[in-house]
Amino acid sequence: MPDGDDDALTHTTADGDAQMVDVGSKPDTARRAVASGDLHLAESTIDAVRDDGIGKGNVLATARVGAIQAVKHTWETIPMCHQIPITNVDTTFDVRDDRVVLEVAVETTGKTGCEMEALEGVTTGLNVVWDMVKAAEKDADGQYPGTAIENVGVDTKEKHHPE
């Protein structure tokens, strides 16, 4: 359950207008955020991903590049995100019997956190997987009845103040 105070929302002015938070007076701090999510796929699609049998190419390698690129460009797609110096991105895929799980860990040293970057990496990485396998996932009507992105969230967020 969130413990934030609704009266303390920082992305709006007193008049309700959107604004970017001023982080200029905050000290540079080492920060890390980890996010993850799942993409449910048919068993036959999972087998093709494992066997590098998708015609578009290596699914996980392409998704890894997409996830990393998304992390680096988060500030361009989420209006109130600051452009932050990304110092590291780790992507980990776990191909299970019925899903691909993606975990993205992002590190920065700066004045604001990197959880939005981690989330952007997860969602884009999973979207890339979906794009790569969509021909295998479509049913006879061109729909995706069993394909779904789920469980996207921030797993951990860390801040290490300088000593």
From Swiss-Prot:
It holds the Pfam family MoaC. The keyword Lyase applies. The active site is at residue 131. One of its GO terms (biological process) is Mo-molybdopterin cofactor biosynthetic process. The keyword Lyase applies. Pathway: Cofactor biosynthesis; molybdopterin biosynthesis. It catalyses: (8S)-3',8-cyclo-7,8-dihydroguanosine 5'-triphosphate = cyclic pyranopterin phosphate + diphosphate. Residues 1-23 are annotated as: Disordered. Its EC number is 4.6.1.17. Disulfide bonds: none annotated. Keywords: Lyase, Molybdenum cofactor biosynthesis. GO terms for molecular function: cyclic pyranopterin monophosphate synthase activity. Substrate binds at residues 80-82, 116-117. InterPro entries: Mo_CF_biosynth-C_arc, MoaC, MoaC_sf, Mopterin_CF_biosynth-C_dom. It is an enzyme of class 4 (lyase). HAMAP family: MoaC_A. Homohexamer; trimer of dimers. Belongs to the MoaC family. Catalyzes the conversion of (8S)-3',8-cyclo-7,8-dihydroguanosine 5'-triphosphate to cyclic pyranopterin monophosphate (cPMP). This is Probable cyclic pyranopterin monophosphate synthase. The lineage of its organism: Archaea, Methanobacteriati, Methanobacteriota, Stenosarchaea group, Halobacteria. The gene is moaC.
